């Protein structure tokens, strides 16, 4: 009997890496959202250092696209409406045991 698992990938325009494999889709989605939220805060703090001025907490917004078995979490700059290069992807896979 096949087992369903969910992989969490962190992807940029140039690289990608597997962050984990989960038995529960909701848990994988929560981790993806948490990673994106943490990265958005890092970007906000970098902006504060660059501009030497306070930057509003909601300047980078976390968005979730739920496409049936796949989920994409990404960050957009609120005013520029541009997506940030990092994306967190949750993909569903079935593991089929070897029938020997």
Placement of each model-derived feature along the sequence:
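Short, mixed-charge low-complexity intrinsically disordered segments
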Residues: 37-100
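Short, flexible beta-strand-to-coil junctions
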Residues: 9-15, 23-24, 65-67, 79-80
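Short aromatic-glycine-(Arg/Gly/Cys) micro-motifs in beta-strand/loop hairpins
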Residues: 1-18, 27, 33-37, 45, ...
């Amino acid at each position: 009997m096949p087992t369903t698992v969910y992989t969490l990938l962190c992807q940029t325009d140039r690289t990608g890496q597997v962050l984990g494999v989960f038995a529960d889709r909701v848990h994988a989605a929560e981790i993806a959202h948490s990673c994106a939220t943490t990265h958005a805060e890092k970007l906000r703090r970098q902006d504060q250092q660059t501009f030497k001025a306070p930057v509003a907490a909601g300047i980078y917004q976390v968005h979730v696209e739920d496409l049936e078995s796949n989920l994409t979490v990404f960050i957009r700059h609120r005013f520029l409406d541009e997506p940030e290069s990092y994306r967190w992807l949750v993909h569903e896979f079935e593991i089929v045991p070897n029938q020997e």
